[in-house]
């Protein structure tokens, strides 16, 4: 089963609105409100499909007009704030000294207002960072991805700091590289030798048991040379 989602929203806080299309939970394109053009998540999508950014901008303008009308005729009771769930993980298997990307996945929050900061050893990082637009999640909530290009090191630790109206305080989600444990060459040799000895012992025991079984068999036809 495949699912496509078309998200349009307008709100009184930044970002003031968004128009985005996704397929099977992956963004296809969104409309940049400042540049007034469609931004394709992958360049290949732009060669396969045609989208008029003006249509998305018109939809956002209509949503803003409807929002103002709703505010004027409502009792001004805001929807409850839903705090986000946050996890941090690397894009690729971690190898110390090899370039990688950290992913901060922020999910199931409302409204779509976030402040996200990457920290390395407790200090803000601004280089090598990128992010998606707000994506659709379950029950009219939102999700978002923030990325950090980095080189894993045993000396560095990272945090994804998320601020949201549903949180009493900024939420820090920690990540640090776990250096793989490598056995010394001598230890590997000993383990290999022990494995060989155990294997040979198993073969010897098997031969002895088979020989005893054949000798104790009452059927003379079973007594054949090995």
UniProtKB/Swiss-Prot annotation:
The keyword Flavoprotein does not apply. It comes from Oryctolagus cuniculus (Rabbit). GO terms for cellular component: MHC class II protein complex. Residues 1-189 are extracellular. Its main location: membrane. This is RLA class II histocompatibility antigen, DP alpha-1 chain. Keywords: Adaptive immunity, Disulfide bond, Glycoprotein, Immunity, Membrane, MHC II, Transmembrane, Transmembrane helix. Pfam families: C1-set, MHC_II_alpha. InterPro entries: Ig-like_dom, Ig-like_dom_sf, Ig-like_fold, Ig/MHC_CS, Ig_C1-set, MHC/Immunoglobulin, MHC_I/II-like_Ag-recog, MHC_II_a/b_N. Residues 211-226 are cytoplasmic. The keyword Glycoprotein applies. Belongs to the MHC class II family. It is a single-pass type I membrane protein. Disulfide bonds join 104-160. The chain crosses the membrane at residues 190-210. Glycans are attached at residues 75, 115. It is found in: Membrane.
């Amino acid at each position: 089963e495949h699912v496509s989602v078309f998200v349009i929203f307008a709100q009184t806080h930044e970002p003031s609105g968004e128009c985005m299309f996704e397929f099977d939970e992956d963004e296809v394109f969104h409309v940049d409100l400042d540049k007034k053009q469609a931004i394709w998540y992958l360049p290949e999508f732009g060669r396969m499909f045609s989208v008029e950014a003006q249509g998305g901008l018109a939809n956002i303008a209509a949503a803003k007009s409807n929002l103002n009308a709703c505010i004027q005729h409502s009792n001004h009771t805001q929807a409850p704030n839903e705090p986000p769930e946050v996890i941090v993980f690397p894009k690729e298997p971690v190898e110390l000294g090899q370039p990688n990307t950290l992913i901060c996945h922020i999910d199931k929050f409302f409204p779509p207002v976030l402040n996200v900061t990457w920290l390395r050893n407790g200090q803000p990082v601004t280089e090598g960072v990128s992010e998606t637009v707000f994506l659709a999640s379950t029950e009219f909530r939102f999700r978002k991805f923030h990325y950090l290009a980095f080189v894993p090191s045993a000396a560095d630790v990272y945090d994804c700091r998320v601020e949201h109206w549903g949180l009493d305080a900024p939420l820090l989600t920690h990540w640090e590289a776990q250096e793989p444990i490598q056995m010394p060459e001598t230890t590997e040799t000993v383990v290999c030798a022990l494995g060989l000895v155990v294997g040979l012992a198993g073969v010897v025991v098997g031969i002895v048991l088979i020989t005893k079984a054949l000798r104790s068999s009452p059927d003379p036809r079973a007594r054949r040379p090995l």
